[in-house]
Amino acid sequence: RRLIAASQPIRGTLVETYLRHRCIHDLHDVGALRYHPRCYHRPDDGGPTQTWAAMIASVTDLGGLITGAHRTWLDPSGTGKAPLETPRKAMGSLLGHAVRFGLAHDVMAAGEGIETMLSLRMALPCISMMAALSAAHLSAILFPETLRRLYIVRDID
């Protein structure tokens, strides 16, 4: 929660540049995404800690309570992810929860990646979307009782 509180909205930031470079231009209902200009990155091998600009995504439960955060460290040019061995990491309680775009209704779409779901959101702007962050988490995601139709979005990777 502190990381999310220390970050800022994405408008006019490197996150917006990164998403637009990914051809994601329609950025509505993206309050779950934030920007941190100097987010710590600790390598898995125990190397020195570095700071990079990052896209911070709030992971929330069905009630909107923040349960975790997902970080995508960005290249300073905004053209892609930072040149790190692991440019994405999540922390907190993720199982059953998701990064949410739009208000939950009776029809929703759920998939793994943030960028995948935002790309689909451009074609289907009225459907709420959820990014589970991994295939394992997608299989465990909790859905609202109001859900009547669910579209599962497949990543090609």
Locations of the language-model features?
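A short, structure-level motif marking secondary-structure boundaries and short turns
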Residues: 1-2, 102, 152-153
